[in-house]
Amino acid sequence: MTTSGTRPAHRPSRKQWVIEAATELFATQPPDEVTVADIASRAEMTSAAVYYHFSSKDQVLAEAMRAFAAALREQLQSITEAQEPGSHTGAAITALLAWMAENRSAATVFFVSSTGMSQEAEALRQESRTQLLEELVRLVRKSRASVSDAEAAVNGLGLLALLETAATSQVRGDDVYRSLGHRSFVREVGDLAERIADPAW
């Protein structure tokens, strides 16, 4: 979705329009440097129209993070449900990484730009981690028929750490990502996921 074209006031999609415009800005500039006026300009509306839906810039950031976290969890749930019992976890993790690449701006805001911005942002990130961990433990259980609760929890934590690190590396395009190239990077992430989920792999 693009932010070209002026929207009539109070249209039902107007709030989402603000979130998407803000996400584009937060992904390319430090959020503390972005103003409500900047968001309004990007969304092609007035600052008053932004304040109609949000009390502050921080609330827009929180809503953007909350929307991404919900979509990320839903995507992982779908991947886990589709996972065949006994199949490898690498493909599931790389599929989630590919989805985040398709939603790069939102992923950048969630994993990079919003870090340390506010207590609410950190609380949202922690809540998301807890939810993702639950799904990753389910994924481990589907891939390994005989795994103890403790081992599934540890493996799930390992997958969560890998996912967060890989997502951050990908959206930043850091030295590791650039030196490997996209295909090799994704392949390495998949192989690591397999070793984490099943050390005997």
Predicted regions and their residues:
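Alpha-helical DNA-contacting segments of helix-turn-helix folds
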Residues: L61-F68, F110, L124-R125
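Pre-recognition alpha-helix immediately N-terminal to the DNA-recognition helix
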Residues: W17-L25, A71, A91, A95
